Amino acid sequence: MAKKIVSDLDLKGKTVIVRADFNVPLKDGEITNDNRIVQALPTIQYIIEQGGKIVLFSHLGKVKEESDKAKLTLRPVAEDLSKKLDKEVVFVPETRGEKLEAAIKDLKEGDVLLVENTRYEDLDGKKESKNDPELGKYWASLGDVFVNDAFGTAHREHASNVGISTHLETAAGFLMDKEIKFIGGVVNDPHKPVVAILGGAKVSDKINVIKNLVNIADKIIIGGGMAYTFLKAQGKEIGISLLEEDKIDFAKDLLEKHGDKIVLPVDTKVAKEFSNDAKITVVPSDSIPADQEGMDIGPNTVKLFADELEGAHTVVWNGPMGVFEFSNFAQGTIGVCKAIANLKDAITIIGGGDSAAAAISLGFENDFTHISTGGGASLEYLEGKELPGIKAINNK
């Protein structure tokens, strides 16, 4: 069933509560990556154009004690948003009370207000994170309609998403709608053939994704640290590479049942240490020396993976191919980025988290159909789970 989106709502003169995802990295009070703010702009600008009065909610980090408040205030976000919108953004350094209510009452059509970090409410019994019903009801009372544009928290049942949805007509923002369309589309209505590329450190993080995608994808390419558990399951020598002993049986079982779909590395860049100065050797993936650790996929594997991607109509990628934070172990991830970017007529999706960070930091931001803003949310969506934040959005 299609979900309501913000453009389905009558917004003129309405106080519109918008749950955005402004959980941005900060260093000394400065925003170091504004991607999440940029992604929220289309929804905010649309509501301004339609004459809505916007009340923005977001969390930022984890507020565990009183001393966390000062460094996790959303004030820098309000300032950045004001510059991007080229208009004043009223910032209220509170999450409830008369001051907030009065500021909302003063809003005119097209005005924008940002409420303080919703997780300030976690100091007193985790009211935000545990979806305290009274808090959700109170926040809902501050507006007329609710727009959820925070895909990054869609897998969480919090007061500021599901709690507010319980009491107000709820629609998806444009970003949330995009995530439902692309990430949800892979799971529910994929354009075949589908190739999934899975990387990152651990098999355990991706088990449920693999279990779900193996029934959807035509091929599953496995790289990154998790590949070594699969190579070990085939009886290959992996040296001191990352290994999850307790996942070898899972890998064996998967290879027995779906070996024709699974593509593993054929060569590996190995070294003795995580360093840009480390001595690197490229060796076949079945004979990694006993004192060496696999750090990245090798050049033959990059070519193999690129060949396997040819002809795909949908590609979904989650997890880097190597320790990309070190430039000498980033070539595998760069090679896969290039191979995906070169595909013609394919829907290409990065499922958030480290692979999204890698693609953006390596300069491939504009070469994919969609780069998800959700880490855990993307993974759980790819597992085939119904996410509470999406479930709470009204159907059309």
Curated annotation (Swiss-Prot):
Q: Write down the chemical reaction(s) this protein catalyses.
A: (2R)-3-phosphoglycerate + ATP = (2R)-3-phospho-glyceroyl phosphate + ADP
Keyword Transferase applies: yes
Which pathway does it serve? Carbohydrate degradation; glycolysis; pyruvate from D-glyceraldehyde 3-phosphate: step 2/5
* Enzyme superclass (EC): transferase
The protein's UniProt keywords, in alphabetical order, are: ATP-binding, Cytoplasm, Glycolysis, Kinase, Nucleotide-binding, Transferase
Q: Name one Pfam family in it.
A: PGK
Q: What is its main location?
A: cytoplasm
Q: Which residues bind substrate?
A: 21-23, 36, 59-62, 119, 156
Q: InterPro entries recorded for this chain?
A: Phosphoglycerate_kinase, Phosphoglycerate_kinase_CS, Phosphoglycerate_kinase_N, Phosphoglycerate_kinase_sf
- Quaternary data: Monomer.
The similarity comment for this entry is: Belongs to the phosphoglycerate kinase family.
Q: Tell me the PANTHER family matching this sequence.
A: PHOSPHOGLYCERATE KINASE, PHOSPHOGLYCERATE KINASE 1, CHLOROPLASTIC-RELATED
Please give the name of this protein: Phosphoglycerate kinase
What organism is recorded for this protein?
Answer: Staphylococcus aureus (strain bovine RF122 / ET3-1)
Name of the gene encoding the protein in the UniProt record: pgk
